[in-house]
Amino acid sequence: MNKGWLELESDPGLFTLLVEDFGVKGVQVEEIYDLQSKCQGPVYGFIFLFKWIEERRSRRKVSTLVDDTSVIDDDIVNNMFFAHQLIPNSCATHALLSVLLNCSSVDLGPTLSRMKDFTKGFSPESKGYAIGNAPELAKAHNSHARPEPRHLPEKQNGLSAVRTMEAFHFVSYVPITGRLFELDGLKVYPIDHGPWGEDEEWTDKARRVIMERIGLATAGEPYHDIRFNLMAVVPDRRIKYEARLHVLKVNRQTVLEALQQLIRVTQPELIQTHKSQESQLPEESKSASNKSPLVLEANRAPAASEGNHTDGAEEAAGSCAQAPSHSPPNKPKLVVKPPGSSLNGVHPNPTPIVQRLPAFLDNHNYAKSPMQEEEDLAAGVGRSRVPVRPPQQYSDDEDDYEDDEEDDVQNTNSALRYKGKGTGKPGALSGSADGQLSVLQPNTINVLAEKLKESQKDLSIPLSIKTSSGAGSPAVAVPTHSQPSPTPSNESTDTASEIGSAFNSPLRSPIRSANPTRPSSPVTSHISKVLFGEDDSLLRVDCIRYNRAVRDLGPVISTGLLHLAEDGVLSPLALTEGGKGSSPSIRPIQGSQGSSSPVEKEVVEATDSREKTGMVRPGEPLSGEKYSPKELLALLKCVEAEIANYEACLKEEVEKRKKFKIDDQRRTHNYDEFICTFISMLAQEGMLANLVEQNISVRRRQGVSIGRLHKQRKPDRRKRSRPYKAKRQ
């Protein structure tokens, strides 16, 4: 295995795929574009590329130069993973292994775990031999390299090909035991750059060291040389975004519970009204189904013609009768319309029907005064409600990511471990769980109850709100949150790293550009219209900033779980060192072997960060407050905006992985066979000679010197020099 290792490009997509081939999980590689800016998030290590000064790396030996920064203590050197590079062109794998095997919080997989255990306590030279004799590493290394160019014939070896090619080398910067080390496989000892400051991260010191090195190599002009590249080994951002989505969906459920509990406390008489209305619904639906004909819904016709039956049609039908079960599946679904209703849901009677909310909501309309409500009632002002088709749910067709999603589905139940007290007992559950939100009349109290019950089944499905509907009341379906719509952006995959990096990328992703940070939520806007009669104040982000619930809970809504007490107090969940919540009602279930879910890790990390910034004191329970319905709706809008934002980020990461694989296929594909076959076919057809002559003639007409034409300049110089000498005489 000492020969045959190929050169690798300094590309974050290549290194990310190489990490996956090594069997490492939860790690990716990002490119650093700006050394002046601070790195966001945890970083396992840096991989630095620079130009190598020697001519031939195949004949080089490990440098024996030792200075004051070299660590010569065998105990320190052997306890870390530092290996001499004994195989040419293996510096990329050496640099990557130097980062991964010196990090204790990385899932290395079977291959690297076995190597780490086997080489524990070995000398750097022995570790170098272990890397060179690992066929799994060599196979993964060469699988991402460009095809090796063919050697030139011996008669054309006048110029050394090695002298004309520039050689580059990879080294690593890793934090080990509180000190920054530079691990270079071509040096006999690791380089110790010392500890970093108390008020800074290790990445800050590493950036300073790298900038000083670039400045020395370029004579004090660090931005005039592009022969350097820097990459960071970071956690997989897909896992981070999925964990944040789990936390946000649990918090959305908690906010809905708080809103439902507030309505139950303020209006206890509504429960009796709800029961009486439920008893009347079967009779009304039965009479309506016997009198009304079967008609096709206009807004469901395109989807039904293709045979795609959506649950939204059943949800819009409400309590009406369904189509017969013996109907073929390729026929459009028929629904029963109430008497007098048209295809568009508009009553044919010219007299407008006043659509009002239930009495308990109209009496507690916080957006209007009682005088204004009486005027609206006298004028017959109704709220128009138009069905809105939900957007297509996000799905990833990538094969390898589907495997990851299967593991994530198993971990979905981890979000259900956090269950707050005071969960209301909803009524009968409707049969639809399609992830839509329907606000029907007149039982708005069941809106939150049905949505909570559906969300407890599967947190990965967008939560829905469902209420019973009386005859003649139109159904309104609104998606739970605004999904990121794919934009007609440039799908070129020539350079997948152009999609952008989390570390100061100069190019912004088209997905993020198409989605604002805080998109307007159709759920909260529609609920605010139903509850309060207006949504202008909730749609403005500036007004949300000054909302009390958003101001108190907004900074921790995506990093920590919310706890709803029995008295309606909503507060963030404080975690102790053991990872268990201070509230007895919300406790994470400890898994086997002490493993924790991504949700628990995210919550612990978020709590630690809040303790560092002074937001939370260790061991101190977090105080909560009661909020008004309008404040809870603003908080719900904030949660759904964060969900939409993280879903866009997750989709961006998935698309970036896809383009990484496309680039890798283009990089590793051998085009020589196709080129040789094409040229041989041209020669067989007698077209090759003519094409060569045409190419040569075009170059001559363009003034390009061919062959020995440039040697005619010497006689011209002698002719010009003779008159000059004669004039001097």
Curated annotation (Swiss-Prot):
Expression by tissue: Highly expressed in testis, placenta and ovary. Expressed in breast. levels in the placenta increase over the course of pregnancy.
Catalytic site positions: C91, H169
A Pfam short name: UCH_C
Cellular component annotations (GO), alphabetically ordered: chromosome; cytoplasm; cytosol; nucleoplasm; nucleus; PR-DUB complex
Note: May act as a tumor suppressor.
Function: Deubiquitinating enzyme that plays a key role in chromatin by mediating deubiquitination of histone H2A and HCFC1. Catalytic component of the polycomb repressive deubiquitinase (PR-DUB) complex, a complex that specifically mediates deubiquitination of histone H2A monoubiquitinated at 'Lys-120' (H2AK119ub1). Does not deubiquitinate monoubiquitinated histone H2B. The PR-DUB complex is an epigenetic regulator of gene expression and acts as a transcriptional coactivator, affecting genes involved in development, cell communication, signaling, cell proliferation and cell viability.
Protein name: Ubiquitin carboxyl-terminal hydrolase BAP1
Species of provenance: Homo sapiens
